[in-house]
């Protein structure tokens, strides 16, 4: 991994119920790796980021190479609370979508999932019932020269187009700062009920929204963001 890298950083993501001293673990990993390579620790913009991810059932080890800013998709329109681009890529990778396959985001917002997928060589389809968001996605795609298909329609359109995509990656709207009148927990319940059974799935939502849901066949992980927001990711 570090053969041609001059710099690296270690990052630990704890999705388990165990408590860890994450800064101490990251420092220990960095010290250990430094002893076996010529690469040096660099906290900002390293050549390689090494990840250790803990969950209650299994642990994951991996790495990501430095992404040059000029090669990343650009946005001319963005909005508060939209999905972080790095987390979007994590979700796409977690369900194993490959180049040439197609991802669908039924709550595409300003198009983060579509932009990141296209930049990874994955085709994309987006849905959003909000005309303003639909237009924002269209403008952002056009700016980057991407040809993703987008529909100004409700998420229930998934049922009609399920044969056109291989997986779903989305961040459900929270109700706050959106034009949705229906309660977010009701949206989540209805959304889960229509999910195609044979598709790869990564869904993110606020933890408390799905506390009472039956989630057969879906793995659940939680990411603590700050004291007032813990997100749940469902993976299939």
Regions found by a protein language model. Give the residues of each.
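Phosphate-coordination loops involved in phosphoryl transfer and adenosine-cofactor binding
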Residues: 4-7, 100
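Class I S-adenosyl-L-methionine-dependent methyltransferase catalytic core
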Residues: 15-31, 38-236
């Amino acid at each position: 991994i570090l053969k041609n890298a001059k710099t690296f950083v270690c990052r630990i993501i704890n999705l388990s119920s165990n408590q860890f001293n994450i800064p101490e673990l990251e420092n220990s990993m960095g010290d250990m790796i430094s002893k076996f390579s010529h690469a040096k620790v660099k906290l900002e913009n390293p050549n390689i980021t090494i990840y250790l991810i803990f969950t209650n059932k299994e642990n994951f080890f991996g790495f990501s190479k430095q992404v040059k800013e000029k090669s990343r998709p650009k946005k001319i329109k963005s909005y508060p609370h939209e999905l972080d681009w790095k987390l979007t890529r994590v979700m796409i990778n977690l369900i194993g979508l490959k180049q040439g396959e197609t991802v669908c985001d039924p709550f595409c917002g300003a198009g983060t999932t579509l932009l990141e997928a296209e930049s990874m060589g994955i085709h994309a389809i987006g849905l959003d019932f909000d005309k303003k968001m639909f237009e924002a996605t269209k403008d952002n795609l056009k700016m980057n020269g991407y040809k993703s298909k987008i529909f100004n329609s409700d998420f229930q359109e998934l049922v009609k187009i399920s044969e056109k995509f291989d997986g779903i990656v989305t961040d459900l709207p929270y109700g706050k700062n959106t034009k949705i009148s229906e309660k977010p927990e009701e949206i989540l319940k209805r959304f889960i009920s229509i999910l195609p059974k044979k598709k790869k799935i990564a869904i993110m939502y606020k933890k408390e929204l799905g506390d009472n849901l039956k989630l057969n066949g879906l793995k659940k992980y939680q990411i603590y963001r700050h004291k007032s927001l813990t997100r749940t990711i469902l993976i299939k």
